[in-house]
Amino acid sequence: MAVTMRQMLEAGVHFGHQTRFWNPKMAPFIFGHRNKIHIINLEKTLPMYNDALKYARQLAANRGTILFVGTKRQSRDTIAEEAQRAGMPYVNARWLGGMLTNFKTLKVSIKRLKDMEAALEAGETERMSKKEALLFEREMAKLQKSIGGVKDMGGIPDAIFVVDVGYHKIAVTEANKLGIPVIAVVDTNHSPEGIDYVIPGNDDASKAVALYTAGVADAIVEGRANAVNEVVQAARGGDGDEFVEVNAEA
């Protein structure tokens, strides 16, 4: 379902940061200011948001992977819930330096986490001493918190979706270094440089964050569904006509 400008207004997407903290590179997306707060031009935001969703939809239709990134308190739960709904990996605790640029090291940690989960499932912790079991549980909980959202990623993602580019500048820098497209919410206090699909908007309000994230997840789900429908149509011959058995005696 398409998001309207009214929904963006109700979610507070148009509220930027204090004027004294602005980044001049966001000037093209600013409508004006009120009470020393910059007001973002939603007539610019809405089509750019839709462009970002179109890209996410196409990427998902081609079986691409989009990594969701949002580690701020007000976005953690939303990022995890929507990424899981879309069947995509996510980072909602802390971005570990090298998650993209040093993926080999991350794979070692992922293997460790999976081995520990398998050991727990097999009941191996029951044979440990209380102290060993406690240390095991602590290590596994720590790994689940930091990399649990990416344990099934399998490799470098095809794109990343970021809420707040300033807070996650290391993630953006790593993606830029590897040529991974970046979809991101950019507020008035940050630069849109290095972002392939800019969504000018409030990156702090929970309702705004929920709106962007749900939209990206919806686009992914829709893209995958469209891809499945195309495969089904192709299997049927492409024209959707029903197969009619011809009686040889007719």
Curated annotation (Swiss-Prot):
GO CC terms, sorted: cytosolic small ribosomal subunit
Keywords: Ribonucleoprotein, Ribosomal protein
Regions that span the bilayer: none
Signal sequence segment: none
GO biological process, any: translation
Pfam families: Ribosomal_S2 (PF00318)
Highest taxon in the source lineage: Bacteria
Keyword Secreted listed: no
Gene3D superfamilies associated with the record: Glucose-6-phosphate isomerase like protein, domain 1, Helix hairpin bin
A GO molecular-function descriptor: structural constituent of ribosome
Family: Belongs to the universal ribosomal protein uS2 family.
PANTHER family in the cross-refs: 30S RIBOSOMAL PROTEIN S2 PROKARYOTIC AND ORGANELLAR, SMALL RIBOSOMAL SUBUNIT PROTEIN US2M
Protein name per UniProt: Small ribosomal subunit protein uS2
Gene transcribed to yield this protein: rpsB
